[in-house]
Amino acid sequence: MTPTPTLVVIGAGAKAVAVAAKAAVLREMGIAAPHVVAVERTAVAANWQADGGWTDGQHRLGTSPEKDVGFPYRSSLVPRRNAELDERMTRYSWQSYLIGTGQFAEWVDRGRPAPTHKKWSQYLRWVADNIDMNVIFGEVQQISVGSGADGQRWAVHTPEQTVHGDGLMITGPGQPERSVLPGNPRVLSIAEFWHRAAQYELIAAERVAVVGGGETAASMLNELFRHRVSTITVISPQVTLFTRGEGFFENTLFSDPTGWTGLTLDERRDALTRTDRGVFSARVQEALLSDDRIRHLRGRVAHAVARDGRIRLTLSTNQGAECLETVHGFDLVIDGSGADAAWFIPLLGQDALDLLELGLGGPLSCDTLQEAIGHDLAVANVTPKLFLPGLSGLTQGPGFPNLSCLGLLSDRILGADIGAGTEADAAAPAEARR
C-alpha cells in the first residue's frame, strides 16, 4: 500500500487552514490527500490577533469575509465530483461559522460588515477545530533536506523536535519586530506599534513618520488618526499614495487568474502595482483625504540615526540616472515597510540552499524565486516540493499571496504530486491545541 504523503506547513494561518480543510474533506470523500501538519510559533491565526504583532485585532478585514477558506468554490481536483467537494467545503464557510455560533442574523441585519481581525481569527480557529487540524507548536530554527530510502524529504527543525515532510509550504509575512533602528525608543517596529495600540496607549509627538506605502502602513495610519500627533509623513518609494482598485474587474483578477499567464511579465507587474503592492484601500484613502495632518515624501530609507533627541532619516530617491539623498528629522518613526515574503531564506540550511540553487540554475534571491513559481505554487525543478504561495503573485495571479482565492490555492497545492516517504517518518503528533 502506498504511504500517505505528509505536507508540512510553516505557519497556521488562513492558507494552512484552507489546505488542511480541503485535505480533510477529500479524505471524507474517500479520495487520497496528504496529511497536513502545521508548525506554528504561537497560535492558530495568531497574526490576526494583537499577540501576533501585525494588528491590535480591532481593525477591519480588508477583503470580504465571504472570501473564506473555500472561496471561490470552483474546485477542479476531482473529476465528476467537484460539485460535491465544493458543497462539502461550504460547511467551513464564513456563513456556516456565523450560523454555527448564532451570529448570522445579526451580521446580515448590520449590513454584512467586514469583521475585525480578531473575529476573523476566531473563524479560522473554528475551522481548525472542526477539522481537528494537526498543529505542532514551536519556532522554526532551520529548514533542511534529508535523504532516506524513498528519496529526499524536508526537515523543519524546532527547539523541541524535527518535523519531516514530503512537501513543504511556507506561509506568513515574517517577523514584525524588525525596524530601521532597533532598540531606539523613538523608532517603533510594527509589533511595538500594535502593542501600544492594543494597550490603548496614546502616542503624543509633533512630527511622526510612517515608513511604507502598503496596506500594513495604511492600517497604521488608520490607527494614528486618533492619537495626539501634529503631522504624519508617509514615506514610500512611489510618486504618490495610490489607491487600490476595488471594482469588479480588479476583484476578478484576484478570484479568477484565468489569462494571467498570458500577460507579459511587465503587464503583470503593472497590474500588481495598481491592485496589490504598495497601495492603500479606498477606505483608508477617504480617511486621509479628510485629515490635513498627512504628508507624503517619496524615497527609500537608506540610513537612520538618532541625533539631538530626534531620528534623522536619509532618503534615497532616483531622478532619472541620478540618485539623490535628502535628510529629514522626526520625533517618532514607525517602520511599517511591510511584510517580507522571503523572510524564510536565512533559515535555509546549506543543503536546502544547494537544492534550490540547483533547481533555479543560479543564485537564490527573492526575484529568482518569484519568477520560478509554477502552476502548483511550488518552485519549479525542485524536488521535494517547496510551495511558496506568498511569492506566487507574479507568475500565477495576485490572489494567491493573500486571502482572495484560498479555495483555488488549496486546489493547486493538493493537486500537486507531493510523493511520499515512509509511514515511520511521518510528522509527530501535534501537541494539545490552544
Language-model features: locations:
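Flavin (primarily FAD) cofactor-binding/catalytic cores of flavoenzymes
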Residues: 1-43, 48, 104-227, 231-434
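A conserved beta-strand/loop capping segment in the N-terminal third of enzymes
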Residues: 73-107
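Short linear sequence motifs
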Residues: 64-66, 85-90, 113-119, 273
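Conserved N-terminal glycine-rich FAD pyrophosphate-binding loop of Rossmann-like flavoproteins
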Residues: 42-83, 241-259
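Generic intrinsically disordered, low-complexity segments enriched for polar/acidic and small residues
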Residues: 56, 68-70, 89, 94, ...
